[in-house]
Amino acid sequence: MNGIAYEVAFWNNVYRWKWTFDGMMNWSKYGGVITLEGFDANAFLIKTDNPKVLDVGCGMSYATGNHIMRDGRLMPLDIRYIDPLAAYFNRIMARHRRKMPEIEFGMAEYLSAFYPSHDISLVVIQNALDHSANPMKSIYESIDVLKKGGCLYLNHHINEAETEHYKGFHQYNICREDGKLIIWNKNERHDVAELTAGFAELTVG
């Protein structure tokens, strides 16, 4: 809970001023093809009819893009923006009259309570899993809502809790060790591949 005030104040300041909002939108992929670092999301999604995407813990950046390119045509993508602070974020957008998609309330740790099982093509979590109250449960829940052959895409700063001295939402670290994806803090340590073996394949970039 300690991080809520900081997050709300940060995004309010971004949306409040034209120059900060325009600066964010200049690097955002919103309005264009979905773009994820190290993963060709468009190529993955066009293999599926009517793909669905969840951007979980999205904040207010709209960074990933909301279209796919299929047969040379730019087509709208069914993408849902999800964050536990949705009520705060939607009020910020309304206050500053920004015309962006509404953010839906949802929590990674309980994703299957908000969305049907085996229905989603791609779940995106960027710089948010380490803010979760239970990162491994968030991974399990994300896998539960994915279709067979679906993808959970994770992209995070390395060991952010250590960098931020465990302040606010920064309670877990994520890193790569000997090719393994590890989630850890001072009290626990998890090898993600080991805990998802048998029902998920893991690629660490």
Predicted features along the sequence, with ranges:
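Class I SAM-dependent methyltransferase Rossmann-like catalytic core
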Residues: 1-48
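A short SAM/SAH-binding and catalytic strip from SAM-dependent methyltransferases
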Residues: 121-134
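Conserved class I S-adenosyl-L-methionine
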Residues: 153-181
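Class I SAM-dependent methyltransferase SAM/SAH-binding core
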Residues: 54-111
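Nucleotide donor/acceptor-binding cores
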Residues: 51
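A short acidic, Gly/Pro-enriched loop at the edge of an enzyme's catalytic core
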Residues: 106, 110-123
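A SAM-dependent methyltransferase catalytic signature shared across enzymes that methylate proteins
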Residues: 174-205
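A short glycine-rich, Lys/Arg-flanked "PGG" loop and its adjoining helix->strand segment in the class I
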Residues: 136-148
